[in-house]
A protein has these predicted regions:
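Active-site nucleotide-sugar/metal-binding loop of Leloir-type enzymes
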Residues: 101-117
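Short, acidic, metal-binding catalytic loop of nucleotide-sugar glycosyltransferases
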Residues: 35-52, 76
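A short, conserved alpha-helix in the catalytic core of glycosyltransferases
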Residues: 206-229
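Short beta-strand-to-loop acidic/aromatic patch adjacent to the donor-nucleotide binding site
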Residues: 114-126
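Conserved donor NDP-sugar-binding/catalytic core segment of glycosyltransferases
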Residues: 126-163
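Conserved donor nucleotide-binding strand/loop of the catalytic core
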Residues: 68-101, 109
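A conserved acidic beta->alpha catalytic loop
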Residues: 50, 56-72, 96, 125-126
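Terminal low-complexity segments of carbohydrate-biosynthetic enzymes
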Residues: 252-375
Length: 375
């Protein structure tokens, strides 16, 4: 079931930007997220150019008042925002829970067909800089080679005046992750609509959809070697998210990541490369049709992969020792600072990898740990 509540209507032909806010049971925290969105300078810039923006809150499988709270804020902003002429806002209630379905619905069904740029974002983050959205959009406007613009993700613990040893370890782990080129954080990014519309997320992808999108975009849909230039980091753009700090939450999150990366490996390094070029060129149509006509196809591929994989560290290439691989990209001084995080990362991979391996063998792919609290 899908129900749409439109708060403000504008002529559809003027929509240039569409923002998809994916929300699940965020009644308590979504207000802060929405206010950080409406504080963005992008609405003033769009208004100046005569452009329009639509904001869709994709409330998926919610059992609380997320949709109602969002609708109230949308109604208030549509009446009081100084640049209210530059946007329309809509709450969409999706009966099916999950980011994968919400993403597909937004990109292929719900967003304005004439939109040139999509912002995809989670509903439990805060936009840190007022110019973030506009700088991300400008990054794509100024660089024809880039298809995705990203900002800088900041853990909330970064702003603590007094950081614990665990906080420092967590921040060092983030430094290791950011050392790789072409990083795509699924919490917030801007993508050219034409590129997004050729991507369909298989329903059993489970997690790490950002890794799947990154691979397709950087390889021009698997037609050439990966090019990091397809993803552009926007200057002066950042958002804040709540860091996992408890050992249990960290292990659960890493378990989810390993499950997702395993499925991406099965798809990208296996199945998709066997497709004829004409099917790769129409990848969204190909994968959507596969999901529709053969709903169990990806689960069979996962089962087949597990039958050929004896040990957890062989779920996908580079799983073991990933922290030390990332450490080599850093300068010597940074290596010393981040060495404890690399050790912790390897130990975490050992624990989470075994749990992910067991979960996959038991047929569990739709695993999603709940955040500890709201930002």
């Amino acid at each position: 079931m899908m129900q749409s509540v439109t708060v403000q209507q504008e002529p559809a032909e003027s929509i240039q930007v569409a923002i998809g806010l994916v929300a699940w049971n965020e009644e308590r925290g979504i207000g802060a997220t929405l206010h950080s969105i409406f504080d963005q300078s992008i609405f003033e810039e769009l208004n100046r150019r005569g452009w329009k923006c639509e904001i869709l809150c994709l409330a998926n499988g919610c059992t609380d008042r997320t949709a109602a709270v969002t609708g109230e804020i949308f109604d208030q902003q549509s009446r009081q925002h100084p640049n209210r002429a530059a946007f329309r806002a809509c709450v969409v209630e999706l009966g099916e829970r999950g980011k994968i379905n919400a993403w597909n619905q937004f990109v292929h069904t719900l967003s304005a067909k004439e939109a040139r740029y999509f912002f995809l974002m989670d509903s439990d983050i805060l936009i840190h800089r007022r110019e973030t959205f506009w700088n991300m959009l400008q990054a794509l406007e100024d660089d024809a080679q880039a298809h995705i613009a990203v900002d800088r993700p900041c853990k909330d613990i970064l702003f603590k005046p007094r950081k614990s040893l665990r906080d420092h370890l967590s921040l060092a782990a983030s430094r290791l992750t950011s050392s790789a080129e072409a990083q795509l954080c699924g919490q917030l990014y801007c993508i050219r609509a034409g590129i997004a519309r050729n991507i369909y997320l298989p329903k059993d992808l489970a997690a790490c959809e950002d890794g799947f999108i990154k691979t397709l975009v950087c390889t021009d849909f698997l037609t050439r070697p990966s090019a990091s230039s397809r993803i552009r980091v926007a200057e002066g753009a950042a958002h804040i998210f709540e860091a996992y700090t408890s050992p249990a939450a960290i292990v659960k999150n890493q378990k989810r990541q390993i499950i997702g990366q395993t499925i991406i490996h099965i798809l990208v390094d296996g199945y998709l490369k066997t497709l004829p070029l004409y099917k790769q060129a129409r990848l969204a149509y190909t994968l959507e049709k596969k999901d529709r006509t053969d709903p169990e196809w990806l689960k069979r591929l996962i089962h087949q992969h597990l039958g050929q994989t004896r040990f957890w560290w062989r779920l996908y290439p580079g799983l073991s020792g990933l922290g030390f691989q990332r450490l080599r990209r850093l300068r010597w001084r940074e290596r010393l600072v981040c060495f404890p995080a690399a050790v912790a990362s390897s130990l975490l991979a050992f624990v989470s990898g075994r749990l992910a391996f067991a979960a996959l063998r038991s047929g569990c792919t739709n695993y999603w740990p709940q955040a500890q609290s709201k930002v």
